[in-house]
Every structure is written in structure tokens, then in C-alpha cells.
Curated annotation (Swiss-Prot):
The keyword Membrane does not apply. It is found in: Cytoplasm. Keywords: Cytoplasm, Hydrolase, Nuclease, Ribosome biogenesis. This is Putative pre-16S rRNA nuclease. One of its GO terms (molecular function) is nuclease activity. Belongs to the YqgF nuclease family. It is an enzyme of class 3 (hydrolase). SMART domains: YqgFc (SM00732). The lineage of its organism: Bacteria, Pseudomonadati, Pseudomonadota, Alphaproteobacteria, Rickettsiales. The keyword Zinc does not apply. Its EC number is 3.1.-.-. Pfam families: RuvX. Disulfide bonds: none annotated. It comes from Ehrlichia ruminantium (strain Welgevonden). InterPro entries: RNaseH-like_sf, YqgF, YqgF/RNaseH-like_dom, YqgF/RNaseH-like_dom_sf.
Amino acid sequence: MLYKNINEFEQVIDKTKRIMCLDFGEKKIGVALSDKTNLIAIPHSVYVRKNTRKDLGSLYGILIENDAGSMVIGLPLDLFGMGNELCDKVMLFANRMIKKYAINIYLHDERYSTAMATRVAKLANIKRKESQKIDDKIAAVLILQQVLDMVKIYQM
């Protein structure tokens, strides 16, 4: 099922499984996973997109291989919180993933995540060329960590 409300998503998370996060882009998708306690986001990989069918299968494979039970996908709203063409593609992708694999997906506002990822890499003295290779998975980590922190607050 598709969730846009963190309270509702928190109630359906399988606490015995990890959470996977995607930073969705036109050419690449950053992937991050929670640790087994669902407290810490860990970078996984940058997946280079092929076509929707292959992308769905490959990303679901990562979910299964890493014992994840639900997914967070960054929703790239504009600066005013409005949807755009990429948001439509993200929602279409999420709905196809749900239809094919029956998993719970939470769409999280990811405004500024790529900019923050670039800034983190710069602060770590990573050269721009190298940073471009990892920005997507850093962005996925930042998105997932925000969600994990929100879930932790709601569980208190």
C-alpha cells in the first residue's frame, strides 16, 4: 500500500525487517537501508536505471536480499511543496512496485536531499567528480534517516 502519512506507515512497518529507501532519479537511483534495529540509515548502492521492468525487479531483489520489509521513496516536490513531472514518475513507479510485489511504500518529501548530499560530500573533502558517483546514495541515507527519526518519535 502507498502511504503519504508517517503515522499510518509507522503502524504497518514490520519491526523485524529492515527498511529500504530510494532516491529516485531519471538515470540513477540511490539506495539505502536501515540497520536491523531500524535506527540508523546505511548507504547501499547507486543503481543505474535500465527500463521500468528491470528496475522493479532489480530493486525488489535488493529489498529481498537485505531482508527489508518496506520501502521509503523520496518524493521530489518543488520548493513550494508542489508536485511535478518527476513526482508523477515516482508515484507511478511506486504504484507499479506495490501492484507487482505487494509491499508498503512511504513517499517522503525529499526537497533539498541531493543538495544536502552534495554538501556532506564537500564537507568530507570528496572531490566533485567522486561526489557525483555517490550523491544519490547519500541522499537516500539522508531521506531514510529523517524517516527513521520520525518513526522513533512516534513510537515514544
